[in-house]
Structures are given as structure tokens and as C-alpha cells.
């Protein structure tokens, strides 16, 4: 198993954190992983993306031109990365902020209304964990247990009390992701 994933959106949406949690989850499950962030000079509001590769075998290069899975959280990311998904790949997008929907017919497209779910949960900071839950439902590259271990590793100890909320958000994401026909 080898999955090459790009996650992209605006800075402040938790894109890099989501990628880091995914990568650490793979490490916790003894998988080979790479995590390669890219972002503009802005801390919030600029574009950010992260490439994560999770594999059972050695990874030759973290630099990719095509992806198995793209998670896009804004219109510029959709326009940039939809053409870079391999035929037969997966595109996941949050319905909030996407005006022109994906058009490719040779990939499987999923919509997840994570922004709405985060508002319902009364915590906008779990947005990225809702997205990650949806991703792991359609492409289970790591387990929930791996994610929980990764949260313990990546979150400062003073924030460990937030792990149950993050795990709840992960489960909610798995419930609300839907394939677009």
C-alpha cells in the first residue's frame, strides 16, 4: 500500500497540522512516511499545502507531480490540484468556499461539509480533524488508534485534554463525507 496525498487550502485552516497528524499516525503504525509542507509568506489567509506519502515500503522521493488523493479546502486549491490527481484517484473537498465544483469524470469525488459540522460542534478548530476523518473513511491509510497516538505525540501536553474532542471530530467526519455522483 502506498498513497500519495496532497492537502491544500488557506493558511489557518489546519492544512499543515492535518498533514503532520496523518504523517505521525503512519509513523505510529510503523509505516514509511514523508511530510513536505509548502506555503506562502502569509501566516493566515495565504495558500498552504502539504504532501504526505504513507507507504508499507520505502519511499524513493517526496516530490510528486501526480497524486492518488487531493484534499482541497478552497477554490484556488481545487483549480490547481484537480488536474494533478491520477486517473482513478480521489478528490475530497469542503463545500464551503468552493464555487465551481470539480468536473473530472475519471476520479471519485467526495464532498464533506466540515465547516458546517465544526460550527455545529461549536469549535472551528476541529475543522481539519473532521476533514481528516472523512479522508480516512474513504482511504483508510491509518487507523483511528494511530491518529490518537499521533495527537498525543504532536499536541503539547497542556492540550491533551482536547484529544477526545479531536477524536469525536474524526468520527463525525467519517459520518458526513458523501460521494458526489
Where does each model-flagged region fall?
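Active-site cofactor/cluster-binding pocket
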Residues: 1-181
Amino acid at each position: 500500500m502506498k498513497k500519495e496525498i496532497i492537502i491544500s487550502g488557506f493558511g489557518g485552516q489546519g492544512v499543515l497540522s492535518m498533514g503532520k497528524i496523518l504523517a505521525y499516525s503512519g509513523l505510529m503504525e510503523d509505516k514509511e512516511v514523508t511530510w513536505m509542507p509548502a506555503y506562502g509568506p502569509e501566516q493566515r489567509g495565504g495558500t498552504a499545502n502539504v504532501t504526505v506519502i504513507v507507504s508499507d515500503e520505502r519511499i524513493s522521493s517526496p516530490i510528486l507531480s501526480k497524486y492518488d488523493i487531493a484534499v482541497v479546502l478552497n477554490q484556488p486549491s481545487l483549480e490547481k490540484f484537480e488536474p494533478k490527481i491520477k486517473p482513478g484517484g480521489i478528490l475530497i473537498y469542503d463545500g464551503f468556499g468552493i464555487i465551481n465544483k470539480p468536473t473530472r469524470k475519471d476520479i471519485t469525488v467526495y464532498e464533506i461539509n466540515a465547516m458546517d459540522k465544526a460550527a455545529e460542534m461549536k469549535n472551528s478548530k476541529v475543522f481539519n480533524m473532521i476533514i481528516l476523518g472523512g479522508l480516512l473513511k474513504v482511504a483508510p491509510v491509518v487507523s483511528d488508534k494511530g491518529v490518537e497516538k499521533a495527537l498525543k505525540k504532536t499536541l503539547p501536553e497542556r492540550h491533551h485534554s482536547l484529544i477526545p474532542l479531536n477524536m469525536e471530530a474524526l468520527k463525525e467526519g467519517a459520518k458526513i463525507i458523501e460521494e458526489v455522483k
